[in-house]
Amino acid sequence: MARFFRRRKFCRFTAEGVQEIDYKDVATLKNYITEAGKIVPSRITGTSAKYQRQLARAIKRSRYLALLPYTDKHQ
């Protein structure tokens, strides 16, 4: 029976030495929301707890300022 080996998840923000996640950096934030507009959990992305909190706060701020949509297209 074949086993599947998954790559170990790591926090990209820790690896890059990011101090604070900026809410104006929409390109980075888009990688951490789904097509439906939900915030992707850290168990999927591998983001550490510290940066997951900053990420959620930044996404919510950018949504409030209309830099990111709350959902995708309403139809």
Curated annotation (Swiss-Prot):
Domain of life: Bacteria
Name this protein carries in UniProt: Small ribosomal subunit protein bS18
Self-association and partners: Part of the 30S ribosomal subunit. Forms a tight heterodimer with protein bS6.
GO cellular component, as recorded: cytosolic small ribosomal subunit
Function noted in UniProt: Binds as a heterodimer with protein bS6 to the central domain of the 16S rRNA, where it helps stabilize the platform of the 30S subunit.
GO terms of biological process kind: translation
Keywords, ordered alphabetically: Ribonucleoprotein, Ribosomal protein, RNA-binding, rRNA-binding
GO molecular function: small ribosomal subunit rRNA binding; structural constituent of ribosome
HAMAP family: Ribosomal_bS18
